[in-house]
């Protein structure tokens, strides 16, 4: 290549698109923080003893166009065939108005979990709609705002039954007609809680002494039967009964709640979310009123704001891991908000009539198929069904299955049986093709005419739904595309996302989710594949997954990876199970003590509790580092039973602990394993690695370091990397499992497979040098913010040379004593300046943790710093008595457009200070749509369903 061609090469252009500050801006920032160069800053920040000795060996960075061409080759290796496997996964039509305006819209997919409700009212409303949809269709009292997948939701239901029930039994009963992948995840969860899983026929439940049970309705083989008597008899024995159900079926069949179920779980995937070779999808859980405070996951509730107006928020947060730690109801952090929103919009768009029509059509097509088969001499395993039939095929099973495969049709292969499931995409041509395989000569039209006289004959009368659902106005208003488009935009406009400005949440890494990375997500070659299709049809997914695992091994210094965990919390769980299985394999199953620093993420102790570990807290010193003296004492005290230590690196205090290798060596010397939480991997890539430091296992948050968007509260992914000695203990899967068949932690072997292309694309376009530069720029941005704010706010922790890692903690406690203004007041006031708040009161109460990421440019960093400095000046005015403590712009924040238009302005500061406090807000203004939300009112007056029509009229 000539010198001119080389100079015009745009191969590495993406790195400059991803990183915010250009070279000139970096020089200004380095000057501000008194660093000679970027490399000099890194040398001052990252301890020399943990620096990698050689650069990462990754393929050269690709341009956006080249990356898309490469990933298209993976996609083309997948074979999308007509699929009737069912088993909890179905083809669906994603309404294009939802595809374009939600799934492909950064206004929806770049938002964060709605911890700050004043700037999250849009997706909070949508998630409330989701809860209402689930409550209506299941016939239950309260629902959460999504879980990771149906199988993990079932495992969560099991632990809910144990917490809420009165039985002393350790037995959990699972019906033998539950989806196999669900049974496997339940077995994994039960083992480490010490529960005994008994699998049996539904009718044997009343004779089984159990604390809880899981039934499937309709069953995995399609049977629809009235479970009322079985549930009633089981409950008389103090057994709480959970039922896995299907939302579309619930439009026609009697809902599980009306049969008396205590808990109802399932997947909302078929409500407009592609199968995606297993995910991501939104699962759901609904339960009775009396169990609401023991239910896991996010719950959206109705409250009021400071003016008494209706406002939404996340309710009952004291159940969750970030507050209750090892006593939490679950370790769940990320849910599936984006997918729950899609499913809820599917229900809003179609309404009761539309959903019922889709259900009727799906059922009618299934009834036609069943009638044709029975008229041709085939026997069905069940004559009562909704969308799935199982045919007793005996010795002909393999021949019929092979015939279907030759016709490019996927059926479900069972022992002496074949299963067929229909969905909203099934056509008459599909039935004709199936009739050809089974040598059925019947006419579809003639069969349809015969069935029309008794449309629901295949649903027993006792199992037919008679109650209404989706009656709330929101499900009966937005049925034209124009109406729906405007509703989606109306909600989007209420929310703050990366389209508006920086989201400087510490420990959350809200970096760019580049458009090029997102494009393959909606390709049908990735979206339309069933996770249990024959493995050879997923050659593209297999190749992409193996290549991604190899890249992640190189980046982390680990020897093997599993992509199965659906979230960071799920990855933690899989990692601790790997450690415990390793100890068990060596005859040391008694090792159950997990050391956790006091600064740890709340998920860490919550996860350790889920593996029945004893959590022992290790102190941190005044500089935020693990206290080695206390660590040594705890190791000595628990040496015989020491299982592991869970550390985060850099620490949650935002510093690189210089003695981290020593920590690992101390634990290893005592026979323990080191779990390194990958939440802060964005400050490691290319500079150091968990494997190099001495860790044995980590999860990676692909939705942080590796650019999968947060989606307003999910999806996420938490793959785990391990050293070779732990590789045999990675999670397996009963279907297409690479690591064996057991210890699954997710419903599908590759977890949320369809979002893996995002992280693959990011790594491919950055290359080794680009990834390393991104880490350096993230550190530069954090140190720049820290140095600009340090004259105005105390910075809590810094490293030996006065530097921070990729985030910094500013201490509001002394300022609160001095001025009366709290960290919450600052967080809410930042909304008036056009920013999402930093992380509040974590890892230290009364602080704000700021992580700007590498993607924010100098202008945005300055805008944020200017806002924080201006807020500090406002605090001084309160301290000096210019504004009273009970009436000032900080305690009254955030301010809305309604505030601006008030006829009477009785505040001691002008409207301009309230609403346009900076020059930047006069150029471009984001408006919160409610005033400060009253959290206490919301929990004391808990309402987790859509407000009545009168609230809309007001």
Swiss-Prot record:
Its cofactor is pyridoxal 5'-phosphate. It catalyses: N(6)-[(R)-lipoyl]-L-lysyl-[glycine-cleavage complex H protein] + glycine + H(+) = N(6)-[(R)-S(8)-aminomethyldihydrolipoyl]-L-lysyl-[glycine-cleavage complex H protein] + CO2. Gene3D superfamilies: Aspartate Aminotransferase, domain 1 (3.90.1150.10), Type I PLP-dependent aspartate aminotransferase-like (Major domain) (3.40.640.10). It is an enzyme of class 1 (oxidoreductase). Its EC number is 1.4.4.2. Pfam families: GcvP2_C, GDC-P. The keyword Oxidoreductase applies. GO terms for molecular function: glycine binding; glycine dehydrogenase (decarboxylating) activity; pyridoxal phosphate binding. It comes from the Bacteria. One of its GO terms (cellular component) is cytosol. InterPro entries: GcvP, GDC-P_C, GDC-P_N, GDC_P, PyrdxlP-dep_Trfase, PyrdxlP-dep_Trfase_major, PyrdxlP-dep_Trfase_small. Keywords: Oxidoreductase, Pyridoxal phosphate. The modification N6-(pyridoxal phosphate)lysine is found at residue 704. One of its GO terms (biological process) is glycine decarboxylation via glycine cleavage system. Belongs to the GcvP family. The glycine cleavage system is composed of four proteins: P, T, L and H. The glycine cleavage system catalyzes the degradation of glycine. The P protein binds the alpha-amino group of glycine through its pyridoxal phosphate cofactor; CO(2) is released and the remaining methylamine moiety is then transferred to the lipoamide cofactor of the H protein. This is Glycine dehydrogenase (decarboxylating). It comes from Vibrio vulnificus (strain CMCP6).
């Amino acid at each position: 290549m000539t010198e001119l061609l080389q100079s015009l090469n745009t191969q590495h252009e993406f790195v400059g698109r991803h990183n915010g500050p250009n070279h000139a801006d970096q020089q200004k920032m380095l000057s501000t923080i008194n660093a000679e160069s970027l490399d000099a800053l890194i040398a001052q920040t990252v301890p020399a003893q943990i620096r990698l000795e050689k650069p990462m060996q990754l393929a050269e960075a690709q341009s956006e166009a080249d990356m898309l061409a490469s990933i298209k080759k993976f996609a083309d290796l997948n074979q999308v065939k007509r699929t009737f496997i069912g088993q909890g996964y179905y083809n669906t039509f994603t309404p294009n108005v939802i595809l374009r305006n939600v799934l492909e819209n950064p206004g929806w997919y770049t938002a964060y979990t709605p911890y700050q409700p004043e700037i999250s009212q849009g997706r909070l409303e949508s998630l409330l709609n989701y809860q209402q949809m689930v409550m209506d269709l299941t016939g239950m009292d309260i629902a959460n705002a999504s879980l990771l997948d149906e199988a993990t939701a079932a495992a969560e239901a099991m632990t809910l039954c144990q917490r809420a029930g009165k039985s002393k039994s350790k037995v959990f009963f699972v019906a033998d007609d539950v989806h196999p992948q669900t049974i496997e995840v339940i077995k994994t969860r039960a083992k480490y809680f010490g529960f005994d899983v008994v699998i049996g026929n539904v009718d044997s439940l009343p004779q089984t002494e159990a604390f809880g049970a899981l039934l499937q309705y309709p069953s995995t083989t399609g049977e629809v039967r009235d479970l009322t008597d079985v549930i009633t008899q089981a409950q008389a024995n103090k057994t709480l009964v959970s039922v896995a159900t299907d939302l579309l079926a619930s439009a026609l069949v009697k809902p599980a709640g009306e049969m008396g179920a205590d808990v109802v779980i399932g997947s909302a995937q078929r409500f407009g979310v592609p199968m995606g070779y297993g995910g991501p999808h939104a699962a759901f859980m609904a339960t009775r009123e009396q169990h609401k405070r023991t239910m896991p996951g996010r719950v959206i509730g109705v409250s009021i704001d400071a003016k008494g107006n209706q406002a939404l928020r996340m309710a009952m947060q004291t159940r969750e891991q970030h507050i209750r730690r090892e006593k939490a109801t679950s370790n769940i952090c990320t849910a599936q908000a984006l997918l729950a929103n899609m499913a809820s919009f599917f229900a809003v768009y179609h309404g009761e009539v539309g959903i019922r029509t889709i259900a009727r059509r799906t059922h009618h097509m299934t009834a036609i198929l069943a009638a044709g088969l029975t008229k041709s001499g085939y026997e069905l395993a069940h004559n009562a069904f909704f969308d799935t039939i199982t045919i007793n095929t005996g010795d002909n099973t393999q021949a019929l299955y092979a015939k279907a495969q030759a016709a490019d049709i996927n059926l479900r292969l069972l022992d002496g049986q074949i299963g067929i499931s229909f969905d909203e995409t099934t056509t008459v041509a599909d039935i004709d093709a199936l009739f050809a395989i089974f040598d059925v000569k019947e006419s579809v039209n003639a069969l349809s005419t015969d069935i029309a006289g008794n449309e629901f004959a295949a649903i027993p009368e006792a199992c037919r739904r008679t109650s209404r659902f989706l009656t709330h106005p929101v499900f009966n208003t937005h049925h034209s595309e124009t109406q729906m488009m405007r509703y989606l935009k109306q909600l989007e406009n209420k929310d703050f996302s990366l389209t508006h400005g920086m989201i400087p949440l510490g420990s959350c890494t809200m970096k760019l989710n580049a458009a090029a990375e997102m494009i393959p997500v909606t390709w049908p070659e990735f979206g339309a594949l069933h996770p249990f299709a024959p493995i050879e049809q997923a050659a593209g997914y297999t190749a992409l997954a193996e290549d991604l695992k190899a890249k992640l091994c190189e980046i982390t210094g680990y020897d093997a990876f599993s992509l199965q965990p659906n979230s960071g919390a799920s990855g933690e769980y899989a990692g601790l199970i790997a450690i415990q299985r390793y100890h068990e394999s060596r005859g040391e199953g008694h090792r159950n003590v997990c050391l956790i620093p006091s600064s740890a993420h709340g998920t860490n102790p919550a996860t350790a509790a889920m593996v029945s570990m004893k959590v022992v807290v290790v102190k941190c010193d005044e500089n935020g580092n693990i206290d080695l003296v206390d660590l040594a004492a705890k190791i000595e005290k628990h040496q015989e039973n020491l299982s592991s230590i869970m550390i985060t690196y850099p620490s949650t205090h935002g510093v690189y602990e210089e003695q981290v290798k020593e920590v690992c060596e101390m634990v290893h010397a005592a026979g323990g394993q080191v779990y390194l939480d990958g939440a802060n991997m964005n400050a490691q890539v290319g500079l150091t690695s968990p494997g190099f430091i001495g860790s044995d296992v980590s999860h990676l948050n692909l939705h942080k370091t590796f650019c999968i968007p947060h989606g307003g509260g999910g999806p996420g992914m938490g793959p785990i990397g391990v050293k070779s000695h732990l590789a045999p203990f990675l999670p397996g899967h009963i279907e297409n499992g690479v690591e064996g068949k057991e210890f699954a932690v997710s419903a599908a072997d590759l977890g949320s497979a369809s979002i893996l292309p995002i992280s693959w694309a990011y790594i491919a376009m950055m290359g080794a040098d680009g990834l390393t530069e991104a880490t350096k720029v993230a550190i530069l941005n954090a140190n720049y913010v820290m140095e600009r704010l340090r004259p105005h706010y105390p910075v809590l922790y810094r490293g030996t040379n006065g530097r921070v890692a990729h985030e910094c903690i500013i201490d509001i406690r002394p300022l609160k004593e001095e001025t009366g203004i709290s960290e919450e007041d600052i967080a809410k006031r930042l909304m008036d300046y056009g920013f999402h708040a930093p992380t509040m009161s974590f890892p230290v109460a009364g602080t704000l943790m700021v992580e700007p990421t590498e993607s924010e440019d100098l202008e945005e960093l300055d805008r944020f710093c200017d806002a924080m400095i201006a807020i500090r000046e406002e605090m001084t005015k309160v301290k000096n008595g210019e504004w009273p403590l009970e009436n000032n712009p900080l305690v009254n924040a955030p301010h809305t457009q309604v505030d601006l238009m008030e006829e009477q302005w009785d505040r001691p500061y002008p409207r301009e200070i309230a609403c346009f406090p900076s020059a930047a807000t006069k150029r471009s203004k984001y408006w919160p749509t409610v005033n400060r939300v009253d959290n206490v009112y919301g929990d004391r007056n808990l309402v987790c369903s859509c407000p009545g029509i009168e609230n809309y009229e007001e």
